[in-house]
Amino acid sequence: MKKICYILLFIMFLVPISTNALENSNENNKDDTKDNSINLIENATSGLLMEQSTGKIIFEKNKDKQVAVASMTKMVAQTIILENIEKGKIKWTDIVEVSKNAADMGGSQIYLNTGEKMSVKDLFKGISMASANDAVVAMAEYISGSEKEFVKLMNNKVKELGLKNTKFKNSTGLDEDGHYSSAYDMGIIARNLLMHEEILKFSSVYEDYLREDTENKFWLVNTNKLVRFYKGADGLKTGHTDAAKYCLAATAKKDNMRLIAIVLGEENGKVRNSETMALLDYGFNTKKVTILKKKNQVIKKIK
């Protein structure tokens, strides 16, 4: 009889424990939905925060609004360059001769000269760190024969990714009518670029040099200051034009989680950086990624 009583008491204690477990599970599910109740990017036109491995949106503001995105455009160009390298169509060591058209590009640049020869690796470094317009046009011409043909590849990539609010007119992101994207589309583009792990070898570097063994040695400083001043940040792409204002696609990794933060239309670089860091802080402080063990993998033996 005593034994039966003990069993009944044990079952009674189990019931509230099970109920609490269900309540906790529901709370966890609520945490997985995007939270727009707080304004993390008050000054931005639009933006979002995404968990990279799942693509889950944690926070968003006007994510589908079509806006100018400046040099964040180059993330698609970078993707195409990396795809061509992975397919063996071009090599990092290939030497590209710079055309007058590429050398004459304005805006951010590494000051290429007409007829100058530079490796694909150094041109890609110039694109990734200095957001160089002359370098991206030189690579566009090397791959497709002309920037116009290369932009067709960029727009095809956009269609391949299923994006509805993006259209490109050039490879640089310089202001042009009909050239636009959205925070959501930029998030997907950034996520796709990060599938090519080679990108982080370039985007994570804060300073480097081009033409290092020549009298024209050129100091490169990453336009994305977060890679130096935010723990875990290792990319990805800045942007700034009159129409786009100040923009940033940032990525950072802490523990098992990588986040992608997009901010568009900020008034200045300082606010852009601070609001991007606020987005990342929010994600890392409130979200967790659980890594599931593989099927049949032994977690712990019970003795």
What are these regions (language model features)?
Residues 163-167, 175-303:
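Domain-terminus/edge residues, biased toward the C-terminal soluble/receptor-binding domains
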Residues 14-15, 86, 287:
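Hydrophobic alpha-helical membrane context
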Residues 1-23:
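Sec-dependent N-terminal signal peptides of Gram-positive bacterial secreted proteins and lipoproteins
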Residues 3-4, 25-31, 295-296:
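N-terminal cationic leader/targeting segments used for protein routing and processing
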